[in-house]
């Protein structure tokens, strides 16, 4: 049975959605999300092999309690910490890919490029998805945490500080997230160099232009430092209203993929990543969450 468990930033209690497999809807164009309601699992690149999946549950789902720490959760939190500190030697393929990205930035072809890579790790005999999910909820209190499964996507567990779209009625929000620094003694850094601020300016200008392309005039607040696990990013909030809340698919299509996971200029960076990154991201760096044009979207 398909399901999604997710914890919205600022909330203490995660929610659970389930759906019979025959009810799952597959979507091949983000515009088809217009007027739709359900839990969306969208890939980095929509394709026949990697469609947008919509779990069409009737509501937000039942609440789940996060019990006191168990020994399993303690072990899971250690696994998360080990992965945060995980270092691996560069493979030749990754080194070549990294150099291609650097060269494209240095010659001025792109203002921003986001390179990712795939790492395979042994999960161990006592690995527990539910324990890791609960541990992540407690460790990353400022992030959107999710654990989901459908036959089309397989199992995905993740955490993201970037909320591509949230809101309801006439109050909607998106963010520009760029620039990275480690926390300083667990606190947000207040001094940011020119490189990080310039990167944030690029992304903010992009989000602003994407909204304006749909006739959306927003109010901005920021940039300001925001938590992202053991790191901090510069963040700018965009607040706006929509003429028609049934057009959320149109908005998601112009925003995705965001510069935080792709690059600038968007279309050129997107094609460069597909041609040079060396693997298919599938649902990594896509977007995920509850969509409801007549209720709350997160």
Indicate residue ranges for each PLM-predicted region.
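An anion-binding catalytic pocket shared by soluble metabolic enzymes
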Residues: 2-13, 122-202, 295-298
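Short, surface-exposed recognition loops or helix-turn segments adjacent to catalytic cores
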Residues: 113-119, 149-150, 222-225
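A residue-level signal for conserved active-site and pocket-lining positions in enzyme catalytic cores
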Residues: 40, 108, 165, 205, ...
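Glycine-rich, small/acidic residue-mixed loop/short-helix segments
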Residues: 265-267, 272-298
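Non-catalytic accessory segments adjacent to catalytic cores
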Residues: 20-122, 127, 188, 194, ...
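Contiguous alpha-helical scaffold segments within structured protein domains
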Residues: 62-92, 98, 122, 175-274
């Amino acid at each position: 049975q398909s399901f999604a468990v997710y914890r919205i930033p600022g909330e203490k209690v995660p929610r659970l959605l389930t759906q019979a497999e025959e009810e799952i809807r597959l979507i091949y164009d983000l515009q088809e999300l217009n007027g739709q309601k359900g839990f969306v699992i969208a890939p980095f690149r929509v394709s026949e092999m990697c469609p947008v999946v919509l779990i069409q549950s009737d509501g937000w789902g039942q609440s789940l309690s996060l019990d006191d720490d168990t020994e399993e959760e303690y072990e899971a939190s250690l696994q998360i910490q080990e992965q945060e500190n995980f270092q691996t030697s560069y493979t030749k393929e990754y080194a070549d890919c990294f150099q291609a990205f650097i060269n494209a930035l240095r010659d001025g072809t792109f203002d921003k490029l986001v390179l990712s890579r795939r790492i395979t790790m042994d999960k161990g005999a006592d690995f527990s998805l539910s324990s890791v999910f609960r541990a992540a909820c407690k460790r990353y209190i400022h992030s959107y945490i999710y654990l989901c499964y459908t036959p089309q996507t397989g199992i995905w567990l993740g955490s993201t500080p970037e909320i591509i779209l949230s809101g309801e009625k006439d109050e909607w929000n998106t963010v520009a997230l760029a620039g990275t620094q480690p926390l300083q003694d667990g606190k947000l850094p207040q001094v940011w160099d020119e490189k990080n601020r310039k990167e944030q300016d690029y992304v903010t200008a992009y989000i602003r232009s994407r909204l304006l392309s749909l006739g959306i005039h927003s109010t901005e607040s920021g940039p300001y430092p925001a938590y992202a696990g053991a790191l901090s990013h510069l963040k700018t909030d965009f607040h706006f209203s929509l003429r028609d809340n049934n057009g959320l698919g149109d908005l998601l299509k112009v925003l995705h993929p965001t510069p935080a996971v792709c690059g600038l200029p968007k279309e050129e960076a997107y094609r460069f990543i597909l041609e040079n990154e060396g693997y298919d991201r599938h649902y990594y760096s896509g977007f995920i969450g509850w969509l409801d044009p007549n209720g709350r979207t997160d």
